[in-house]
Amino acid sequence: NLYIPLATTEGALVASVSRGCKAITDSGGATADSYRVGTTRGAVFHVSGLVENDKLNTFLLNHFKELQQVARQTSGHLKLTKFFSRGLGRFRYVRFVFDTQDAMGMNMATIATTSVSRYIETNAGVRCISVAANYDVDKKPSWLNIIEGRGMKAWAEVIISEKTLRETLKAT
């Protein structure tokens, strides 16, 4: 037996969770998997036009190791693993992806993105408008986070028999 702590004032929720656990057990258990995707923070930079936008993207690609070093200096528990970069007119959106080990790490990611953005401003001659430009899509559902990933991804599956559906879950 495995006991799962559940604290709620809603008694019906406890009964519902118990039925779900029984259905999973009666079905032979569940299969689950998880993997770390990374904590993201999406900055936006203002550039003079399309040519400078392309130059900034090239700068980011050519200086990734330096960007990693700048990020690493902000925390021993953080590593810049990759970035996604999208140009839109006079704006370059950069979604930085960090491994923050076992922490959710949003504060670490924000501090690191601020430092990395300052480095980019100084060395690429562009201006960072915001270190949180909604390219990270924090605190709301987004297909971008499903497609590119964010935080931890967890998947679980169980195949429930018709009998268990009918008898335990009272469904047809």
Whereabouts are the PLM-identified features?
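Small-residue-rich
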Residues: N1-G89, V94
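A structural signal for small-residue-enriched, beta-sheet-centric alpha/beta enzyme cores
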Residues: Y35-G42, K82-T114, R118-T172
